[in-house]
Amino acid sequence: MPHQLFTSESVSEGHPDKIADQISDAVLDAILIQDPKARVACETYVKTGMVIVGGEITTSAWVDIEEITRCTLAEIGYVHSDMGFDAHSCAVLSAIGKQSPDINQGVDRIDPLDQGAGDQGMMFGYATNETDVLMPAPITYSHRLVKRQSEMRKIGQLPWLRPDAKSQITFKYDKGYAVAIDTIVFSTQHEEDVTQKQLEEAVMEEIIKPVIPTQWLSSSTKYFINPTGRFVIGGPMGDCGLTGRKIIVDTYGGMARHGGGAFSGKDPSKVDRSAAYAARYVAKNIVAAGLADRCEIQISYAIGVANPTSIMLETFGTEKITIQKIMSLIHQHFDLRPYGLIKMLDLLKPIYRATAAYGHFGRDVFPWEATDKAELLREQAGLNQ
């Protein structure tokens, strides 16, 4: 097979869609602190000078949505009208309703283990051994670039940076393995008086070089840094932002399939979120155990029904034991019923705001990134002999 090129992108916490995701998840976290059993589906819209927070929330908690919104915007860095958005002066509108009782009766049960899925749908999880975090290289390094931009901005190393930024990396693959970087694209919002030459040099020296391993780079690697030559108007002034519009950035950068459901603003009774996390947990432990080099899992559910309607496993010919044996180990060691996976991954804690920028996967601070079952899986697969 000839060389193939594969591209993934990421966006910073100051991107309009990511602002919306972070506000939705900040509201969710604030509610879970008081009421872990709350039902939350929180959507956010941001545009110049305005934030609208809406959705369906059923809870005994009271949270100050306006204060949460302003604090989130300030933490991201939108604190002055010069940036086109100011946390302190923007309008914040709330339009919150309650979850339908028709859904409640399908989800809530006397025995928690019988808790039904909050909706139908299919979710995917994926892992690959091509990076240290068992994630695809293109999305991993795309995330790290925009995360580095945020760090340089917040510590004042590059004080002319502004919150909105995007990255995109094209990797060259040979026989399914990443071998080199073909192209790096990086665009960052900046103050008006910064020259293109000054910006290009700073981005290369302070953002790209510290993040990208030299073994991926060569004299033929192409760089496009702020290729339009100007990125002063950005954030919500440049584009409106909506919760749930960056689902490929949130997951595997297009390297794996996606069921279509967004994550942010949803409590873990919504399998769009919790089952996608569980699928990643299963796939990562399979790869960490050495049962396969690459692994993709699909799980599907019916609303109000506890047990998955299907589980699919794809290892792309990299499996070290039979697919049937791996499937047997999944059924034996992973409870993929809605309550089972919530308990397995301890998902009722207020951990979601941190997921809403720089990827839900590939960062070890999250419980679904643990590889605590890998040794057991390896032993029962007979690979320790």
UniProtKB/Swiss-Prot annotation:
Gene3D superfamilies: 3.30.300.10
Cofactor note: Binds 2 divalent ions per subunit. Binds 1 potassium ion per subunit.
Annotated GO biological process: one-carbon metabolic process; S-adenosylmethionine biosynthetic process
Protein's pathway: Amino-acid biosynthesis; S-adenosyl-L-methionine biosynthesis; S-adenosyl-L-methionine from L-methionine: step 1/1
UniProt keyword annotations, A-Z: ATP-binding, Cytoplasm, Magnesium, Metal-binding, Nucleotide-binding, One-carbon metabolism, Potassium, Transferase
Molecular-function GO terms, alphabetical: ATP binding; magnesium ion binding; methionine adenosyltransferase activity
Cofactor(s) demanded: Mg(2+); K(+)
Region described as Flexible loop: spans on this chain: 99-109
Catalytic activity: L-methionine + ATP + H2O = S-adenosyl-L-methionine + phosphate + diphosphate
Subcellular location: Cytoplasm
Enzyme Commission designation: 2.5.1.6
Entry binding sites for K(+): 43
Pfam families hit by this protein: S-AdoMet_synt_C, S-AdoMet_synt_M, S-AdoMet_synt_N
Key word ATP-binding present: yes
Residues that coordinate or bind L-methionine: 56, 99, 239, 270
Keyword Magnesium listed: yes
Binding residues for Mg(2+): 17
Family: Belongs to the AdoMet synthase family.
Function: Catalyzes the formation of S-adenosylmethionine (AdoMet) from methionine and ATP. The overall synthetic reaction is composed of two sequential steps, AdoMet formation and the subsequent tripolyphosphate hydrolysis which occurs prior to release of AdoMet from the enzyme.
Matches recorded under HAMAP family: S_AdoMet_synth1
Quaternary context: Homotetramer; dimer of dimers.
Record protein name field: S-adenosylmethionine synthase
